[in-house]
């Protein structure tokens, strides 16, 4: 759990060798990059708000790795973290985002009309579609580092902004503190609300401090546009609905997101963004678009096929279990989404999901008729 910088000065009484974490059993991006030399060079640095190298790496020290997913193992505490600790973050980002270089520039495209197709995914196989992203509000520390006052200020700003939305986006805010245990669980089960802070990644990085203070969910009246406030990021914006109309989900996502961004800009609080990293978020894995376009899709035959993993890899897609990142697939229903966040625009990422899922559903239908799919396996995208 992050400490104040005074604690960091206390640690400096010990040599870098004495303080260097034991990463011998670790399988995460941070552990691959952090050497005793790098630790020594960066450990006395801190951002203007007092975030230190030990704060950056603590979650990766406490969580050696994940059996299915190579975790990142480090977080940012504020916008400046990516600059002050760039000697650690840059190689992690390059590793995690397919060779994205420190000199590369990220591109943004939130024009939903540039998406081709996406309104014809077969609802017999595609059960639900959703697109999400994160946003950070300039001038405030990020969740691993923010104070109670900062967190409450972020909530106040966000609620004022969201409550001014109209039309299809008109909705209301539900603070976590005011919910009963049952209401909370129901929203989690319906995939509307973030889970309780049991994830070791959340706990070790300090994001769960003061829980549930200043956390909540805002959604429009028909629950197709949601905003989580103060979980892993200041804001998580989600557009979702049942069935396979990804085109409509993406339209609502882009339109709603632009409206929110406008309101924040007018209030003098733009979102954190840089030309190199795109939208700045807490976890380096989400930099760039922060976008995850995903569908819940039923693939009983294809998921048993020996080339299933390779097909996903070639389509630049990632699979998760039905309930999210740490869960198993129930009834052969997988959560399939884009693997990339940085270096591709929002439209390009959703296009990969639409095209890839369409192809996989066609493969599933072929396998149902006991026909081979070898000639359908795509080249690497």
From Swiss-Prot:
GO biological process: phosphocreatine biosynthetic process; response to heat
Pfam family, one: ATP-gua_Ptrans
Tissue: Predominantly found in skeletal muscle, but not in the heart.
Residues involved in ATP binding: 128-132, 191, 236, 292, 320-325, 335
Region (Disordered): 99-118
Catalytic activity: creatine + ATP = N-phosphocreatine + ADP + H(+)
Keywords: ATP-binding, Cytoplasm, Kinase, Nucleotide-binding, Transferase
SUPFAM superfamilies listed in its UniProt record: Glutamine synthetase/guanido kinase, Guanido kinase N-terminal domain
Domain Phosphagen kinase N-terminal stretches: 11-98
InterPro entries to which the protein is assigned, alphabetical: ATP-guanido_PTrfase, ATP-guanido_PTrfase_AS, ATP-guanido_PTrfase_cat, ATP-guanido_PTrfase_N, ATP-guanido_PTrfase_N_sf, Gln_synth/guanido_kin_cat_dom
EC number: 2.7.3.2
Subunit structure: Dimer of identical or non-identical chains, which can be either B (brain type) or M (muscle type). With MM being the major form in skeletal muscle and myocardium, MB existing in myocardium, and BB existing in many tissues, especially brain.
PANTHER family per UniProt: ARGININE OR CREATINE KINASE, CREATINE KINASE M-TYPE
Protein name from the UniProt record: Creatine kinase M-type
Organism listed in the record: Gallus gallus (Chicken)
Lineage: Eukaryota, Metazoa, Chordata, Craniata, Vertebrata
């Amino acid at each position: 759990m992050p400490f104040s910088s005074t604690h960091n000065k206390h640690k400096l009484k010990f040599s870098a060798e004495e303080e260097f974490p034991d990463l011998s059993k670790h399988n995460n991006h941070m552990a691959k990059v952090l050497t005793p030399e790098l630790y020594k060079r960066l450990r006395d640095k801190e951002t203007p708000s007092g975030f230190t190298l030990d704060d950056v790496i603590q979650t990766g020290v406490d969580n050696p790795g994940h059996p299915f997913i190579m975790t990142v193992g480090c977080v940012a505490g504020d916008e400046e973290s990516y600059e002050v600790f760039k000697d650690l973050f840059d190689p992690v980002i390059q590793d995690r985002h397919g060779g994205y270089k420190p000199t590369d520039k990220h591109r943004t495209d939130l024009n939903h009309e540039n998406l081709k197709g996406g309104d014809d995914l077969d609802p017999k196989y595609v059960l639900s579609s959703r697109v999400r992203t994160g946003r950070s509000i300039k001038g405030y520390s990020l969740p691993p580092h923010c104070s109670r006052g900062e967190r409450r200020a972020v909530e106040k700003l966000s609620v004022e902004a969201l409550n001014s939305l109209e039309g299809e986006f008109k909705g209301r805010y539900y603070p976590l503190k005011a919910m009963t245990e049952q209401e909370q669980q129901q929203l989690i089960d319906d995939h509307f609300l973030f889970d309780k802070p049991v994830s070791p990644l959340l706990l070790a990085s300090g994001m769960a401090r003061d829980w549930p203070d200043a956390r909540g969910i805002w959604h429009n009246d028909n629950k197709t546009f949601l905003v989580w406030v103060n979980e892993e990021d200041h804001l998580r914006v989600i557009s979702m609905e049942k069935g396979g109309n990804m085109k409509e989900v993406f339209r609502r996502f882009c339109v709603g997101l632009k409206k929110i961004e406008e309101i924040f800009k007018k209030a003098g609080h733009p979102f954190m963004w840089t030309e190199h990293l795109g939208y700045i978020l807490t976890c380096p894995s989400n930099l760039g678009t922060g976008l995850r376009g995903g569908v819940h899709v039923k693939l009983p035959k294809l998921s048993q096929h020996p080339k299933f993993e390779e097909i996903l890899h070639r389509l630049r897609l990632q699979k998760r279990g039905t309930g999210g990142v740490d869960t198993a697939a129930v009834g052969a229903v997988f959560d399939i989404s884009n693997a990339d966040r940085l270096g591709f625009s929002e439209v390009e990422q959703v296009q990969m999901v639409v095209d890839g899922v369409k192809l996989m559903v066609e493969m599933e239908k072929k396998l149902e008729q006991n026909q081979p799919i070898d000639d359908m396996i795509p080249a690497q995208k």
